[in-house]
């Protein structure tokens, strides 16, 4: 226990930068948030201005302190969580970025990834980095900057440039250019990192022609990396002491630190992580193998899977079908009927991800009879989110041999009690919704607080990680399996819909 009273989590996301002030009981005291510019130079290209990322993040740090009326000497530490994979390259001597940040969503390096596949590197990349070959990850973005920005490759070869994901950039700026580090969770998303040896991979650097000198040092997610002071030079020095990529930070914020523990974040899509302990499991179902934290913030492993369309399907009901006026209405309409009347909605608007991996699948509504109405369609759309979650979690359990203990949940759609209850029913496990909804920030705060002695250990945190509500599954196994069988039948009929007839 220290005489400090607060931790600040910096939550640097894809559309906004946030600072979250937490007290010793892990309660949120104050939040500051600033949105920043999304830059779309061409179709499929997405960029951010690194200086704007820093400006919005540093201003929220100042603002959260000012709004709460606390002083810098009451702050024990700062933790960082960030949008993953987004890539920044800057000059070591001036701190000036040589190009905008290339965002995780950006598809500009598809030709580079196509060549990696054509050259036969898929299996090596899969086995070494745990990732699939895709423009999503940082490695090909770094190569693009070095190949396309005038003078960048020459400067990199001379040791004059630095690369970092957003966490690295923020630590470098917070410490006035003294510290160039990342953590294992962010390193594992670069496609340059060997997740087994926990080192930068020489062969990947050679394949992508990236000089080792630009890479940050890789450290644990919970340790003191350097110090900063709020509001410019002078003043109290505050340790920067925790780093984790956003999904791994959420896993830690839920205190899922042991094998078999999982979380699902319900946003536009869903991000699911299943902790697999010290086993790096190569998925047979197209899931990613990634690094997560153990109780001490040291690297262990997780399987990661995503659902493309979750909350977005409710927006579709609102914006395109116009059968709900507000996303919050979906629960009300779903409960106006006692079941879905045999209706299934497969929201494969952009294809289907794990475990189907079919880009040609398309959305469909099945099982319509004369008695089907709008309420049945709303109910079936909500149920589709839970069914897709079961699809991914079954793939995870199949790959890992781990039986899910319970599912911790966060994200906007978790406020929908009907959806959460149906999720428990269809998975046959308890679904736990936490009191503190800022789970990603909480993970970064926990990591920083443990590194600085603000909290003693995870046992102390367990008392603070309160569950607001537990949704327990219906005991009717026959009904559960009948419903899921119907879902699988509906999905089967949606597959390959957009594929041109080969005849």
UniProtKB/Swiss-Prot annotation:
Q: Name one Pfam family in it.
A: FGGY_N
Family the entry assigns: Belongs to the FGGY kinase family.
GO cellular component, alphabetical, reads: cytosol
Give me the residues that bind ATP, please.
Answer: 14-16, 268, 311, 315, 412
Description of how activity is regulated? Inhibited by fructose 1,6-bisphosphate (FBP).
Q: Provide the species name.
A: Haemophilus influenzae (strain PittGG)
The residues that the entry says bind ADP are 14, 18, 268, 311, 412, 416
Q: Which residues bind glycerol?
A: 84-85, 136, 246-247
Q: Where are the transmembrane segments?
A: none
For whether the record's keyword set contains Lipid metabolism, the answer is: no
What's the top EC group for this one?
A: transferase
Keyword Nucleotide-binding listed: yes
**What Enzyme Commission number(s) apply to this enzyme?**
2.7.1.30
HAMAP family referenced in this protein's UniProt entry, alphabetically: Glycerol_kin
Which pathway or pathways does this protein act in? Answer: Polyol metabolism; glycerol degradation via glycerol kinase pathway; sn-glycerol 3-phosphate from glycerol: step 1/1
The entry's sn-glycerol 3-phosphate-binding residues are 14, 84-85, 136, 246
User: Can you say what this protein is called?
Assistant: Glycerol kinase
Q: Which GO terms describe its biological process?
A: glycerol catabolic process; glycerol metabolic process; glycerol-3-phosphate metabolic process
The record ties this protein, via InterPro entries, to: ATPase_NBD, Carb_kinase_FGGY, Carb_kinase_FGGY_CS, FGGY_C, FGGY_N, Glycerol_kin
Outline what the protein does.
Key enzyme in the regulation of glycerol uptake and metabolism. Catalyzes the phosphorylation of glycerol to yield sn-glycerol 3-phosphate.
């Amino acid at each position: 226990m220290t005489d400090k009273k607060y931790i600040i989590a910096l939550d640097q996301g894809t559309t906004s930068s946030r600072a979250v002030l937490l007290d010793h009981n892990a309660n949120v005291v104050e939040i500051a948030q600033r949105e920043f510019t999304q830059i779309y130079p061409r179709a499929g290209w997405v960029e951010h201005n690194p200086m704007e990322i820093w400006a919005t993040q540093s201003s929220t740090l100042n603002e959260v302190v000012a709004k709460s009326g606390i002083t810098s000497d009451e702050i024990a530490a700062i933790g960082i969580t960030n949008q993953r994979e987004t890539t920044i390259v800057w000059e070591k001597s001036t701190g000036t970025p040589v190009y905008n940040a290339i965002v995780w969503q950006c598809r500009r390096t598809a030709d580079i990834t196509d060549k990696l596949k054509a050259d036969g590197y898929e299996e090596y990349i899969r086995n070494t980095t745990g990732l699939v070959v895709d423009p999503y990850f940082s490695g090909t973005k770094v190569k693009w900057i070095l190949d396309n920005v005038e003078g960048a490759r020459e400067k990199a070869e001379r040791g004059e440039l630095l690369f970092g994901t957003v966490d690295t950039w923020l630590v470098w700026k917070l410490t006035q250019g003294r510290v160039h580090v990342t953590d294992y969770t962010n390193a594992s998303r670069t496609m340059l990192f060997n997740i087994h040896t926990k080192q930068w991979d020489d062969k990947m650097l050679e394949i992508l022609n990236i000089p080792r000198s630009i890479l940050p040092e890789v450290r644990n997610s919970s340790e003191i990396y350097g110090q900063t002071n709020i509001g410019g030079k002078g003043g109290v020095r505050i340790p920067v002491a925790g780093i984790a990529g956003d999904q791994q930070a959420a896993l830690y914020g839920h205190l899922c630190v042991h094998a078999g523990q999982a979380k699902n974040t319900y946003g536009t899509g869903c991000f699911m992580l299943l902790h697999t302990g010290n086993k790096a499991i190569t998925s047979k179902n197209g899931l990613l193998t990634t690094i997560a934290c153990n109780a001490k913030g040291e690297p262990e492993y997780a399987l990661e899977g995503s659902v493309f369309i979750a909350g977005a399907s409710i927006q579709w009901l609102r914006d395109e079908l116009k059968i709900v006026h507000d996303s919050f209405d979906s629960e009300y309409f779903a409960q106006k009927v006692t079941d879905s009347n045999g209706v299934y909605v497969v929201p494969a608007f952009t294809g289907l991800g794990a475990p189907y991996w079919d880009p040609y699948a398309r959305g469909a509504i099945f099982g319509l009879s004369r008695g089907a109405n709008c309420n049945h369609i709303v109910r079936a759309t909500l149920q589709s989110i839970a069914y897709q979650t079961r699809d991914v979690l079954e793939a995870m359990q199949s790959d890992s041999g781990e039986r899910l203990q319970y599912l911790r949940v966060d994200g906007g759609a978790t406020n929908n009690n009907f959806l959460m209850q149906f999720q428990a029913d269809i998975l046959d496990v308890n679904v736990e919704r936490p009191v503190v909804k800022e789970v990603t920030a909480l993970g970064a705060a926990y990591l920083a607080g443990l590194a600085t002695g603000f909290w003693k250990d995870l046992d102390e945190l367990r008392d603070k990680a309160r569950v607001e509500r537990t949704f327990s599954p219906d005991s009717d196994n026959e009904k559960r399996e009948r419903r899921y069988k119907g879902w699988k039948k509906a999905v089967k009929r949606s597959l390959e819909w957009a594929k041109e007839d080969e005849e």
